[in-house]
């Protein structure tokens, strides 16, 4: 491994280790997301704690910290293999941040950001898959799980040279959602939004 590749991987990990959820919550004087809500320092939990505006800020920074190192490595001529390692390093930084005792989030937004430099068509498909799943089910975690499962197939169709590293990213995301999968199976997962029951009349509650 070259010094350049090693440097990019380390830079990606350090970028990922900057926990947007924790830092933004501190900035807005909100509770630590690691100790409130679901306990996960990610945009969905911040949505529960601080509302849409703060959650959107966290989401943007989580995406950017995956996108920046991969975009930089891409434009500096890194091979697909090392681009994949750079993307994985950014997500590992988010999940196991060195600056926050190695206790981080689940890496979904950071993974999306890391995939973005590969192609905006892929990014659009991934985002659309997540949004459609969440709109139909109400579960943010299910959106992440479905997107992670289908991402390698999207990449194989559009940019096959990146299939293996994206498959590794997907495995990482699915492993981090192990508890969510169990709660979904038991019907105990918390929805981010609920459909209104149209069967209820105006006088029913």
Curated annotation (Swiss-Prot):
The keyword Lipoprotein does not apply. Keywords: Cell inner membrane, Cell membrane, Lipid biosynthesis, Lipid metabolism, Membrane, Phospholipid biosynthesis, Phospholipid metabolism, Transferase, Transmembrane, Transmembrane helix. Pathway: Lipid metabolism; phospholipid metabolism. It is found in: Cell inner membrane. It catalyses: an acyl phosphate + sn-glycerol 3-phosphate = a 1-acyl-sn-glycero-3-phosphate + phosphate. It comes from the Bacteria. Catalyzes the transfer of an acyl group from acyl-phosphate (acyl-PO(4)) to glycerol-3-phosphate (G3P) to form lysophosphatidic acid (LPA). This enzyme utilizes acyl-phosphate as fatty acyl donor, but not acyl-CoA or acyl-ACP. One of its GO terms (molecular function) is acyl-phosphate glycerol-3-phosphate acyltransferase activity. One of its GO terms (biological process) is phospholipid biosynthetic process. This is Glycerol-3-phosphate acyltransferase. Probably interacts with PlsX. It is a multi-pass membrane protein. The chain crosses the membrane at residues 3-23, 53-73, 80-100, 112-132, 138-158. Its main location: membrane.
């Amino acid at each position: 491994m070259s010094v350049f590749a090693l440097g990019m991987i380390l830079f990606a990990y350090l970028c990922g280790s900057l926990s947007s959820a924790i830092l933004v919550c501190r900035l807005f004087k909100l509770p630590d997301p690691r100790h409130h809500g679901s306990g996960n320092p990610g945009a969905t939990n911040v949505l529960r704690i601080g509302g849409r505006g703060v959650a959107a800020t966290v989401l943007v920074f989580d995406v950017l910290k995956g996108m920046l190192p991969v975009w930089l490595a891409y434009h500096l001529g890194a091979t697909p293999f090392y681009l994949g390692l750079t993307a994985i390093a950014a997500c590992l930084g988010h999940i196991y941040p060195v600056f926050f005792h190695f206790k981080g989030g689940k890496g979904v937004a950071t993974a999306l950001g890391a995939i973005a430099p590969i192609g905006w068509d892929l990014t659009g498909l991934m985002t659309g898959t997540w949004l459609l799943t969440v709109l139909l089910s109400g579960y943010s975690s299910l959106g992440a799980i479905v997107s992670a499962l289908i991402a390698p197939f999207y990449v194989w169709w559009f940019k096959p040279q990146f299939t293996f590293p994206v498959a590794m990213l997907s495995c990482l995301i699915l492993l981090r959602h192990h508890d969510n999968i169990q709660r979904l199976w038991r019907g105990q997962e918390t929805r981010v939004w609920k459909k209104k029951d149209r069967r209820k009349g105006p006088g029913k509650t």
